[in-house]
Amino acid sequence: MKFMLNLYVLGIMLTLLSIFVRVMESLGGLLESPLPGSSWITRGQLANTQPPKGLPDHPSRGVQ
């Protein structure tokens, strides 16, 4: 009975380890080579961005 419990706990630990490794691999892949069109922004992309331009004036207000 104790032998079966040890096998059960070992199976759970190996499953959790496998899930952890897969998650870390996917996160590492995203950090190394983000997909084009992905919502992830790398540090280099943040440094190269231009400040956003303001909204154009509404035509009915006119330019002052």
UniProtKB/Swiss-Prot annotation:
Provide the alphabetized UniProt keywords: Lipid droplet, Membrane, Secreted, Stress response, Transmembrane, Transmembrane helix
Query: Where do Polar residues bias regions lie?
Result: 42-51
| Gene Ontology MF terms | signaling receptor binding
| Regions of compositional bias (Basic and acidic residues) in chain numbering | 55-64
Q: Give a GO cellular-component term.
A: lipid droplet
Q: Does the keyword Magnesium apply?
A: no
> What does the record say about induction?
By hypoxia (at protein level).
Disulfide partners: none
Q: Where in the cell is it found?
A: Lipid droplet; Secreted; Membrane
Q: Which domain of life is it from?
A: Eukaryota
| Region Required for targeting to lipid droplets, residue ranges | 1-37
Please give one Pfam family short name: HILPDA
Q: What GO biological process terms does the UniProt entry carry, in alphabetical order? A: autocrine signaling; cellular response to hypoxia; positive regulation of cell population proliferation; positive regulation of cytokine production; positive regulation of lipid storage
Protein's organism: Mus musculus
Q: What does this protein's UniProt record list under function?
A: Increases intracellular lipid accumulation. Stimulates expression of cytokines including IL6, MIF and VEGFA. Enhances cell growth and proliferation.
Alphabetical list of InterPro entries matching this protein: Hipoxia_HILPDA (IPR026190)
- For region Disordered, the annotated ranges are 42-64
Which protein, by its recorded name, is this?
Answer: Hypoxia-inducible lipid droplet-associated protein
Question: Any stretches that span the bilayer, and where are they?
Answer: 7-24
Q: How does it sit in the membrane?
A: Single-pass membrane protein
- Coarsely, its chief localization is other
